[in-house]
Amino acid sequence: MWMSMSRAIVNALTMLSTVVLAWFLVPADFGLVALGTTMLAIVTGATELSLTQALIRHENPRDSHFNAAWTLNTIRGLIIFLLFALAAYPAAKFYGDTRLTGIMLALGFSVFLSGLINPRLITFQRQLIFKQEFFLSVSQKFVGLLASVVVAATWHSYWALVVGIVATQLTNVVVSYAIFPYSPKITFQHFKDFFSFSAWLSASQIANTLNWRFDILLIGKILGATPLGYYSMGNNLAILPTRETTAPLKQTIYPSFANIRHDPNRLAAAYQRAQALVTAIALPVGVGFAVVAEKLVVLVLGEIWLPVVFIIQALAAVFAVQTIGSLVQPLGMAQGETKMLFKRDMQMFVVRVPIILLSAMQFGLNGVICCRILTGLLSTYINLILVKRFIGVTVFQQLYANTRALVSAALMATGVIAISSYFPIATGKLETFAQLAAQIVIGAVLYCGVNFTLWYLMNKPQGPETEIIAILSQISSKLRNRVLS
């Protein structure tokens, strides 16, 4: 419950932040800051030590393990800050924009702050207790939103985006120690233990970060800040519904898989159950978001942002389909198959970056989006192959387990598009809102109706429908007991 509430509130705050900042800033502002945040993501990915996963997987971490994790994170944060300070001027010169210098210095400082976070919070995650995570996530997002909106409304400057990031990290550190008092000590014990687990996982993180971030640097250099601003905004909005609806589930999945990793049959059953539930929830949300993208953009962002509609439509649908194999990451980590995850990410990097580079040079932003669709589907297939290797569940079995969700989402999208074609042209915000609400309601009814009809026709097999009915029954029972008491 706490994780669901946390993600719902964080999701709402993220959307609110995006909308409000889009009112005060221009696409070029988002593109400029996206260059800095992308370089930051690549550097942090290249130095990622996966200490959280190592502490979760450890049988019985002691104080010395937490102190070692804090020491490593602090050293890493300081190194990244120094690297960004040294690279700030050359990067600004390369992209021909001196404003990047200050942006990179501020972003580097934010990473140094993040390295100071309390590693003891992992204790709650290991025990699947998420109340504290709720307060941490909501507080940091709220402070970041407040800081960025104040700067944007006052100065209409790209610094609003940067200040929000720094404020978020500062709040993250302060609240982490308020929730779980802890006095860190510098120690160099257990470094070998951490590196033995995280070596391949860190390499995988490097490849994965380059894989999914390098295109932003290419677009910024080849196409400029304004197209990059559209691309960055579209990409961020497209991934938002899928990511936020599945985050509460995904946060509990890795610890759960790690706890049963020595029982192959239980692990395979748990994976199939979790994957079907994730897809049943995320697929209709992502596909539905793609269908309503045009009216949503006009309503909340304004017509200046209309070029992001195609980006959202294409990428939101791809992100939704990718959830079919998205749990391969926690599955592979739980089984210690981090080397295989690294190989996967390197294969995708070698395929993806050259194609996107050529597409950007020859066909512009639309060419990049088409390549994203193709490589997204390819990565989904590779993930399904890896799942088969890890736990023996065939690709056909994985797809069959998601048949109802796939068919229901396809019919939902078709139905909403067909019915929407009869809507009159909206002439104002109120009409646009009414049509958007109608699309959402129609989509929800179609998806649920088709899904549960198929489930009934298939003799009610065990699946996400069973899980959802059980959850609704528990909620109904609790409400009934409260009313009667």
Regions found by a protein language model. Give the residues of each.
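Specific pore-lining/lateral-gate transmembrane helices of multi-pass inner-membrane transport
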Residues: 57-72, 230-346
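Alpha-helical transmembrane segments of multi-pass membrane transport and lipid-handling proteins
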Residues: 8, 15, 71-96, 102-106, ...
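Membrane-interface junctions at transmembrane-helix termini in multi-pass inner-membrane proteins
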Residues: 54-63, 113-138, 159, 180, ...
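Signature of the first transmembrane helix
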Residues: 1-49, 76-90, 105, 110, ...
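Membrane-proximal transmembrane or re-entrant/amphipathic helices at the cytosolic face
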Residues: 388-395, 417-485
